[in-house]
From Swiss-Prot:
Reported phenotype of the disruption mutant: Feminized males, which display features such as the absence of one or both gonocoxites and gonostyli, or antennae with fewer and shorter setae than normal males. Mosquitoes shifts the alternative splicing of dsx and fru toward their female isoforms.
Underlying gene: Nix
GO cellular component term, pick one: catalytic step 2 spliceosome
CDD domains listed in its UniProt record: RRM_SF
Residues passing through the membrane, by range: none
Coiled coil: none
Keyword vocabulary terms for this entry: Differentiation, mRNA processing, mRNA splicing, Repeat, RNA-binding, Sexual differentiation
The protein's name in its UniProt record: Male determiner protein Nix
């Protein structure tokens, strides 16, 4: 049964990968909500997975799932953009593994050893090395090691000729990379993502209910939706004077409960109104 269920999850994940983007080099201080707000500009998001901060590294990766494939294409303009003091990696999750590799013939590694109080950020490194040649991607593995992948081998060779490199009175050691580097920070070996990660992207514990009658109450919503499992929080959205905006959010204790509620209640009648039920980012439930 477990193998069959895992096969189902893998099949479902292969479908939704087309709606997902991989984001690398997110600042350690950024929350899920910060990422959702930044990327929601390009379309409605329905889920997010973010890895916790790693030791000795002030950036982290995430995956955002959109409702539309068009949103994936639009969001790619944020690749190599600044987010705080870092430079983002933004790529479609559906790319083959080889597209996540920084190729050795166009890539250098920069070793950072800040000797004074003026630290050097990824954004500052990007601005300096961009003067040498167009940068395809940057990937930070630790606070002291950043890979820079140029568009051309010529730019890579020119960057090596600049050493020793000086920014903020800090000297940087630059070396040529001897092998391809995987810049997908979720798995150092491949894109064979864990079953747990897949579940988090396929199903979350939050659903949005849209098209509710204007007189709907949180108590009535709880009566109808509690049959799918334990509810941790219900938020009915109202305007400044307290009138219902006719939608709300439910946060379940288990993802299976949220999934059952979505499958069964989407398109059903709620006291005279046909409602729409869909997954929403979990942070949205508490944003009130």
């Amino acid at each position: 049964m477990c193998k069959k269920r895992n096969a189902e999850i893998n099949a479902e994940f292969d479908i939704i990968k087309k709606y997902c983007i991989y984001i690398g080099n997110i600042p350690f201080f950024a929350s899920k909500n910060d990422v959702v707000v930044k990327f929601a500009e390009y379309g409605e998001t329905c889920n997010i997975y973010m890895q916790s901060n790693k030791p000795h590294c002030d950036v982290k990766p995430a995956i955002v799932r959109y409702r539309s494939r068009k949103s994936v294409d639009k969001s790619l303009c944020l690749n190599n953009s600044k987010f705080g003091n870092t430079i983002l990696i933004v790529l479609p999750l559906s790319l083959p593994y080889s597209r996540y590799l920084l190729t050795y013939d166009t890539c250098i590694v920069v070793y950072i050893n800040d000797k004074n109080s003026c630290k050097t950020s990824m954004a500052e490194l990007y601005d300096e090395f961009q003067k040498i040649g167009d940068i395809q991607n940057m990937f930070k593995t630790t606070n002291n090691m950043i890979y820079i992948n140029f568009e051309s081998e010529k730019s890579m060779q020119l960057s090596l000729a600049t050493k020793p490199f000086l920014i903020n009175n800090n000297i940087f050691k630059i070396k040529k990379v001897e092998r391809n580097i995987n810049m997908c920070g979720l798995n150092s070996e491949s894109q064979d993502f864990s079953t747990n990660l897949k579940k988090k992207l396929l199903y979350n514990r939050s659903i949005g209910i849209f098209g509710l009658p204007s007189n709907a109450t949180e108590e009535r919503i709880a009566q109808i939706f509690s049959r799918f499992g334990d509810i941790q929080k219900i938020t009915l959205i109202c305007d400044v004077v307290g009138n219902s905006k006719q939608y709300g959010f439910i946060y379940y204790k288990k993802r299976t409960s949220a999934n059952a509620a979505k499958v069964i209640m989407d398109g059903e009648n709620f006291e005279g109104n046909k409602i729409s039920v869909r997954f929403v980012p979990e942070k949205k439930v508490f944003k009130n």
